[in-house]
Amino acid sequence: MAVKEKKEFPPFEYPQGYQLFAGVDEVGRGPLVGDVVTAAVILDPNNPIEGLNDSKKLSEKKRLALLPEIKEKALAWSVGRCSPQEIDELNILQATMVAMQRAIAGLSVQPDMALIDGNRVPELPMAGLAIVKGDLRVAEISAASIIAKVVRDQEMEELDKLHPEFGFAKHKGYPTKAHFEAIEKHGVTEHYRKSFKPVKRILGID
């Protein structure tokens, strides 16, 4: 019987025959409210950025410190999104794929290959490669993760100013106990994803 190996992923080796790689990642598949946000980043190999790591493992302070450096040093970066209405129409998986397509299409320089965090690649006009735990293994994906996370968090903070009773700045729209209590008390706004089960239940749809 084989010895169970630790879940350590090997260092990523960039495929040969390609020059420009875009890293792509998403933030916000799980929340009940707001857009699913994706980012695409092409880094400059001659201008490396120290301290890139998966955005979820970095402190907010570190993410905010890295953001301007990524934007300044990257050859190109872009944000793509899908709205709650689009998520309800398409489903969250398809909406995430569309948001990734939009992020890549928005790059001022088009890559030879898109490196996508996860296990699915959207339909693209260039080569694409899905990389499990890519946000930990590939600098371009880490940079995309940081941009997407900061953008979405800031949008939740803005939404919190409009609707402070929901506590968006704290839970960022994710399904927490405090969030459910706020929905039970105040209902939902147009920013909610009405196809998500907890929201359907509150609205009496399901």
From Swiss-Prot:
UniProt record, GO biological process: DNA replication, removal of RNA primer; mismatch repair
GO cellular component terms given for this protein: cytoplasm; ribonuclease H2 complex
Domain RNase H type-2: 19-206
Cofactor, free-text remark: Manganese or magnesium. Binds 1 divalent metal ion per monomer in the absence of substrate. May bind a second metal ion after substrate binding.
A Pfam family it matches: RNase_HII
Compartment(s): Cytoplasm
Keyword Cell division annotated: no
Enzyme class: hydrolase
InterPro entries: RNase_HII (IPR022898), RNase_HII/HIII (IPR001352), RNase_HII/HIII_dom (IPR024567), RNaseH-like_sf (IPR012337), RNaseH_sf (IPR036397)
Protein known as: Ribonuclease HII
Source organism (scientific name): Vibrio atlanticus (strain LGP32)
